[in-house]
Amino acid sequence: MSLESLFSLATLGAGLLVVIGAALARGRLFAIFVGVLLTIQGLISVALFDYFEPIWPIYAYLQATVDLHFLSLARARMRPLWWRATVSVPGLFFAAGTMLALPWAVVDAFGVTPHFAWLAFVVAAWGVVQSIWTREEEIDLALDEATIERVRRHPRGKAGDKRPLRIVQITDPHLGPLMSVARLRRICERAVAREPDLILLTGDFLTMESQAAASILEDSLAPLAALEGKVFACLGNHDHEAPLLVRSALASAKVRLLVDEEAVVETPFGPVQLIGADFKFRGRKAHLEALSRAYPRRPGHLRVVMLHDPGAFRHLPADHGDLVLSGHTHGGQLGLLTLGLPWTFVSVFTPIPDHGFWARGKDRLYVHRGTGVYGFPLRVGVPAEESLLRVHVQREVP
């Protein structure tokens, strides 16, 4: 039997064992997800084996890490550094690289040598860097007088003479193999060190690995307790998988969770009315209309809405969000932002605002790129974000 045949049998057999383990340990839906992902990844890996055969021991090791990583999710927990370094990160790198190499696998299927297939893995290697490292930045957002007919991108504008509202937004950290407790803790420490007026957390704190114990998220967010009274949060879709754990961890860090609630905060900028919207899969228009009726605008207060999913921005009643802060999309996670182009997977295939500054009417939306990873194995071309937002109000607040 040839080396290629042995690799093919081993890859597809290991994938089948992982799916069986996933079904027994976590149920049918997770097994289907893993089965689809590993089937696609495995077929591409097998198709490209002959091209990479000169380095087959490395290629086989990387394929094994993919299967081991997804098998470990059957008993999901935060793994030690040695496991992440030798299994999880290599496995996610190889899974991303092989899926990015799909065009070369198609070429190979037609009997053409897939020249330059290694480029997909160079891109995936850069994706690892973008997934585990963030660069601090400062962003000016001007709330201007313009009235915009429909949801669309909007210029950030320029800084004004008046003192801006200073906000640090943390969103979608997704504690897991690419976001350790230590890394999220450092992000929180740097947020506190910037001495913002507000720190706003817009959801999706966990992955399957970090749902094992509340102490994981508690330890990660602990530095935020230093700014008690200035730190608020709303829930994301993944937070509903372990709501009691998330609530407990936020309370431990002195973070006030707003679930369809408001908070009024006095800041050096002036009074701010904060609205925290719960995440809803259905009935979002009715939900946001009811929330706006329950908490009408307070005169003279800047109205800031924490809304995890930017796709719901269009359902917010008009003039009810001077500034809406969202996450959820991870900035598109796959895109060309690194090359200076605005296109991402989300913007190409959906109408959902994916990253940056948007407008509708006089309402403004900022979509944070997030710090973590979920879904596709890595960030590719869309760097994580760790920013200080300086909000310049250049119009009268009702």
Each model region followed by its residue ranges:
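Canonical alpha-helical transmembrane segment with a positive-inside/aromatic-interface signature
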Residues: G111-R153, I167-Q169, L178-S180
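Soluble catalytic domains of enzymes that build or remodel membrane lipids, polysaccharides, and related
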Residues: A142-P398
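Hydrophobic, well-ordered secondary-structure segments
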Residues: V107, L119-V122, E138, L184, ...
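Non-catalytic terminal accessory segments
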Residues: M1-E136
